[in-house]
Amino acid sequence: MCDRNGGRRLRQWLIEQIDSEQYPGLIWENEEKTMFRIPWKHAGKQDYNQEVDASIFKAWAVFKGKFKEGDKAEPATWKTRLRCALNKSPDFEEVTDRSQLDISEPYKVYRIVPEEEQKCKIGVGNGSSLTDVGDMDCSPSAIDDLMKEPPCVDEYLGIIKRSPSPPQETCRNPPIPDWWMQQPSPSLPLVNGYTGYEQHHSGYSQMVITFFYSGRLVGHITTSYPEGCRLSLSQPSNHGEKLYTPDSLEHVRFPSAEAIQNDRQKQITKKLFGHLERGVLLHSNKQGIFIKRLCQGRVFWSGNTVVYKDRPSKLDRDEVVKIFDTNLFFRELQQYYNNQGRFPDSRVMLCFGEEFPDTVPLRCKLILVQVEQLCVRQVMEEAGKTCSSPMLPDDVQQEQVYRIFQDICGPHQRPLFRENQQIAV
């Protein structure tokens, strides 16, 4: 069954605002309350009144946590946010023949699409895709709608650069070492992968990186350099860039956007690429996975160290962030064996250019990158085979977890990635 709780959030909120009659111009279009008008005056008009004409857009920004009193007012950004949310949502459909945009008080008309009209599709297309995204789905034309009005693309990419980060914890953690600004250890191999690296650590240093464009699997790689990797569009070419990319770092490139079949999805993805040129740095060790954002475009993430799991988490530029805690993963796995918790998630998700997590289903995200530690992923596979009887004695369970970990993270590691891998987020 397909459950679009994310879409319901916008739908229910907007219906409540219309019924409140607090926003000038936001009214029902018909008695059946299946269509509504929303004011659409351009901010450049002489008679534009921000308090009136932008009130519903501001309310959405406040509701989403993107604006609070005292912040700089950005009515154009507020409007773009709500417009793109409406265009992406399968719950709404613009009724263009009823909209009036060339009058003194312009407005658009949207129809609330009945649930029975909304088809829950399992996949975006043939081949590997995000076939299980937390029981969420989206209209196949969601990103197409985003591209209908050419200005929306530039404004949308403007949001990518302008939006503030969500509130962070008041008590900050101790600073994390910046491995990329340190000299690589001479005991580690710099070119030939992890051959000479300590066997106890080799499984931690390798990462499995999987790329999804608009929900479709477009590429994957298992890294082998113990110092980490740089994920970007091209090889660094100037001296300044090389300061961030020592020779010991493996270079991992984003797959080409040419793999995207839909022309408009391809167009906006290429535009987004323009803001991701410098990419991000990734490092994995016994403690976990760490990232450093270098690119201009925003990067959002989810992992087992995220503070707020129900709101977007943005990476600050040039700051090293721990996005996966290996010890926490194994503690949660032990709790699962003790029948005291859920099966832990081994994955980190990176979303480039778009807020994440939010109400937009994952299939509508332009660029998603999944990152996992190689040995932890293999532990998950083995644990999934052996955890069918969670009522084993505690001492047996602890020994079982230890044995699985030792077998997988030892010197003889087996290949991980399966070509038909599907991701459940």
Swiss-Prot record:
GO terms for biological process: cellular response to lipopolysaccharide; cellular response to type II interferon; defense response to bacterium; defense response to protozoan; dendritic cell differentiation; immune response; immune system process; myeloid cell differentiation. InterPro entries: Interferon_reg_fac_CS, Interferon_reg_fact_DNA-bd_dom, Interferon_reg_factor-3, SMAD-like_dom_sf, SMAD_FHA_dom_sf, WH-like_DNA-bd_sf, WH_DNA-bd_sf. CDD domains: IRF. PROSITE patterns: IRF_1, IRF_2. Its main location: nucleus. It comes from the Eukaryota. One of its GO terms (molecular function) is DNA-binding transcription factor activity, RNA polymerase II-specific. Plays a role as a transcriptional activator or repressor. Specifically binds to the upstream regulatory region of type I IFN and IFN-inducible MHC class I genes (the interferon consensus sequence (ICS)). Plays a regulatory role in cells of the immune system. Belongs to the IRF family. This is Interferon regulatory factor 8. It comes from Gallus gallus (Chicken).
